[in-house]
Amino acid sequence: MKEGIHPNYREVVFQDMSSDFKFITRSTIQTKEMITLDGKEYPLAKIEVSSESHPFYTGQQKVLDTAGRVEKFRNKFGSKIGKAAK
């Protein structure tokens, strides 16, 4: 590998802004902010969604009623489309 062309791979704290959940992982992300966690200073990357706040992982997801939407569409436009094609 060539020297000086690879990004710095280091430990970084990712903070979920919606739930204030923080976790440490390794990344090459460039950040300007720093945070102290467990007595050690790390670069800080702020994110909007993590497994702590995403509806799929928290069990708070909504199920869309697509069958009702399709039936509503067919009731409104179904007969018009069939007549126009003839």
Curated annotation (Swiss-Prot):
Subunit and partners: Part of the 50S ribosomal subunit.
Superkingdom, natural source: Bacteria
PANTHER family: 50S RIBOSOMAL PROTEIN L31, CHLOROPLASTIC, LARGE RIBOSOMAL SUBUNIT PROTEIN BL31C
Protein name according to UniProt: Large ribosomal subunit protein bL31B
Family per similarity comment: Belongs to the bacterial ribosomal protein bL31 family. Type B subfamily.
Molecular function GO terms recorded: structural constituent of ribosome
Keyword set, alphabetical order: Ribonucleoprotein, Ribosomal protein
InterPro entries in alphabetical order: Ribosomal_bL28/bL31-like_sf (IPR034704), Ribosomal_bL31 (IPR002150), Ribosomal_bL31_B (IPR027493), Ribosomal_bL31_sf (IPR042105)
GO biological process: translation
Organism the protein comes from: Ralstonia pickettii (strain 12J)
Pfam families according to UniProt: Ribosomal_L31
Record's GO cellular component terms: ribonucleoprotein complex; ribosome
